[in-house]
Amino acid sequence: MASGCKIGPSILNSDLANLGAECLRMLDSGADYLHLDVMDGHFVPNITFGHPVVESLRKQLGQDPFFDMHMMVSKPEQWVKPMAVAGANQYTFHLEATENPGALIKDIRENGMKVGLAIKPGTSVEYLAPWANQIDMALVMTVEPGFGGQKFMEDMMPKVHWLRTQFPSLDIEVDGGVGPDTVHKCAEAGANMIVSGSAIMRSEDPRSVINLLRNVCSEAAQKRSLDR
C-alpha cells in the first residue's frame, strides 16, 4: 500500500517576505511536509525561487521537515545536484520537461533524493505509466501549473483513480485548488498526498484545516481498503 495520508501546504500563497516563519507556522500546525514550488519563467510563466532559498530554509528549519520540490522548470536535469546539496528530500519533475525520464530518475536517486513525477492537466496519465514502478510519487496537477489560487479541475480525478487502480502502492499527490470543498473528490479517487495552498495559508486556524484534510483523506483510504 501507499504510505499514509499526508498534507503538504504549498507556500506559493504565503507571505514570501517571511518565508521561514510561514513554513514554521505550517509545521507547527501539523503539516506532514512542505511543498516548495520552483518556477523558472520558461516552463511556466511565473518565477519563484531556487536552491539558495531552499538552502536557507533548511538551515532555519533544521533537518526534520520533508521538502517536496515541485520543479516547474524547463531543464530539470540542471537542478538535481544543487537541490540535493541545498537539502531537498524529494525532487518532483514534470514529464513534459524532459526527453529522458529514466536518466533523470537515476540521477535523482544517485543524489540521495526521492523521485516524484508530475503531469500537467493536458498530459495523458498513460504516459506516466512506464515510469510508475521507478518513482516514489506521481503528481497529478489539478490546475494549470504556474500560479496559486486557481479553480480545481475535477475532470483530473479519473487520472488519479486510474493510477491508484494500476499502482496500488504508489504515493499519489494532487496539487491545485484543493481545500475543504474539494479534498473528498481527490481522496475518493485515490490520492494520499494532498497539496493545499490558499485554503491552509489564508486560514486563521491552519491546524483545523490540515486536520480536516487529513481526516477526509484517511477515511477514504480506509473505505478503499474495506472495499477490496
From Swiss-Prot:
Homodimer. GO terms for molecular function: D-ribulose-phosphate 3-epimerase activity; identical protein binding; metal ion binding; protein homodimerization activity. A divalent metal cation binds at residues 35, 37, 70, 175. Catalyzes the reversible epimerization of D-ribulose 5-phosphate to D-xylulose 5-phosphate. The keyword Manganese applies. NCBIfam families: PRK05581.1-4, rpe. Pathway: Carbohydrate degradation. It comes from Homo sapiens (Human). Changing residue 141 to A: No effect on enzyme activity. The active site is at 37 (proton acceptor), 175 (proton donor). The modification N-acetylalanine is found at residue 2. Its cofactor is Fe(2+); Mn(2+); Zn(2+); Co(2+). Binds 1 divalent metal cation per subunit. Active with Fe(2+), and probably also with Mn(2+), Zn(2+) and Co(2+). PANTHER family: RIBULOSE-5-PHOSPHATE-3-EPIMERASE. GO terms for biological process: carbohydrate metabolic process; pentose-phosphate shunt; pentose-phosphate shunt, non-oxidative branch. Keywords: Acetylation, Carbohydrate metabolism, Cobalt, Iron, Isomerase, Manganese, Metal-binding, Zinc. This is Ribulose-phosphate 3-epimerase. It catalyses: D-ribulose 5-phosphate = D-xylulose 5-phosphate. Belongs to the ribulose-phosphate 3-epimerase family. The keyword Chloroplast does not apply. Its EC number is 5.1.3.1. GO terms for cellular component: cytosol; extracellular exosome. Substrate binds at residues 10, 70, 146-149, 175-177, 197-198.
